């Protein structure tokens, strides 16, 4: 019986890596041998090696939308990356490549195309990121998460699959989460997720109105690295953490309402878990504007309340929390009606087909 092999790639941020992990259990169940290609120093190396998946490093230049002197040297790093990836692919002879985006994927996808190895890519955001835009001509299929994304994909390569969500995230234990936080009072739980680096403006806005919030809620605040406030360490009902990984499913199960950035992976997890949410997307000035588009789509569908970062202040945040609670059933019903589910099975079907399984 033929042993099938897949090489996965994606990196630069956790959002380009964790969706890969959501596919791993199913791929293993199907008998796929899994290898990974990432950068030498990216976050993907730490995440993937913890999962005991064989990891290859390649050279990769950063893709920028702005002028930088490195724009003249990085194409040579990409070229070296293509040669690095080509050697790995010649050695491993995979049946299919799965690419999750991030600049490290571009050399891998180009090398795979040159060797006629099928490439399945996935884009979480509403509009394709720069890496997926560049890699798109070399892909066979580009899986997307939002129905609106299909209009941006050329040559009929786009497939609406949804985003892959880790099974363990959907199986959190509320009581285990409560025990972990050790809340004394049995109130509703408000959770704030500012991303792995945190958000200064969200952290400050929340902390200014903590006393008001704590009248109604226990608070779990994922504030990002280096953003703990020591003066609030012993405040009853308030738990702050720089970052949570292992316990996240339990804390998500415990949360009644979530305030979050609008990265695609996070918001689709909130939708899958049917969590009331307020989204504060990273402004277009500080990014390519993908979070603004993601949030607008969710607001239009009735899944989320949205506050623009430029308009955020403590008073507006407190008012929005109260308004969301008043309209709780309306938002929950919209989420229940959503036909967008976990994308794992849809993507696995495309991978199997591409590998001629």
UniProtKB/Swiss-Prot annotation:
Its membrane topology: Peripheral membrane protein
GO biological-process terms attached to the record: carbohydrate metabolic process; cell division; cell wall organization; lipid glycosylation; peptidoglycan biosynthetic process; regulation of cell shape
Family matches, as InterPro entries: GlcNAc_MurG (IPR006009), Glyco_trans_28_C (IPR007235), GlycoTrans_28_N (IPR004276)
Top-level lineage group: Bacteria
An MF annotation (GO) of this entry: UDP-N-acetyl-D-glucosamine:N-acetylmuramoyl-L-alanyl-D-glutamyl-meso-2,6-diaminopimelyl-D-alanyl-D-alanine-diphosphoundecaprenol 4-beta-N-acetylglucosaminlytransferase activity
A Gene Ontology term for the protein's cellular component: plasma membrane
Subcellular location: Cell membrane
Pfam families cross-referenced by the UniProt entry: Glyco_tran_28_C (PF04101), Glyco_transf_28 (PF03033)
EC category name: transferase
Key words, A-Z: Cell cycle, Cell division, Cell membrane, Cell shape, Cell wall biogenesis/degradation, Glycosyltransferase, Membrane, Peptidoglycan synthesis, Transferase
Pathway as given in its UniProt record: Cell wall biogenesis; peptidoglycan biosynthesis
List of residues binding UDP-N-acetyl-alpha-D-glucosamine: 13-15, 166, 196, 291
Record CDD domains: GT28_MurG
Enzyme Commission number: 2.4.1.227
Catalytic activity: di-trans,octa-cis-undecaprenyl diphospho-N-acetyl-alpha-D-muramoyl-L-alanyl-D-glutamyl-meso-2,6-diaminopimeloyl-D-alanyl-D-alanine + UDP-N-acetyl-alpha-D-glucosamine = di-trans,octa-cis-undecaprenyl diphospho-[N-acetyl-alpha-D-glucosaminyl-(1->4)]-N-acetyl-alpha-D-muramoyl-L-alanyl-D-glutamyl-meso-2,6-diaminopimeloyl-D-alanyl-D-alanine + UDP + H(+)
Family: Belongs to the glycosyltransferase 28 family. MurG subfamily.
Functional note: Cell wall formation. Catalyzes the transfer of a GlcNAc subunit on undecaprenyl-pyrophosphoryl-MurNAc-pentapeptide (lipid intermediate I) to form undecaprenyl-pyrophosphoryl-MurNAc-(pentapeptide)GlcNAc (lipid intermediate II).
Protein's name in the database: UDP-N-acetylglucosamine--N-acetylmuramyl-(pentapeptide) pyrophosphoryl-undecaprenol N-acetylglucosamine transferase
Record organism: Clostridium perfringens (strain SM101 / Type A)
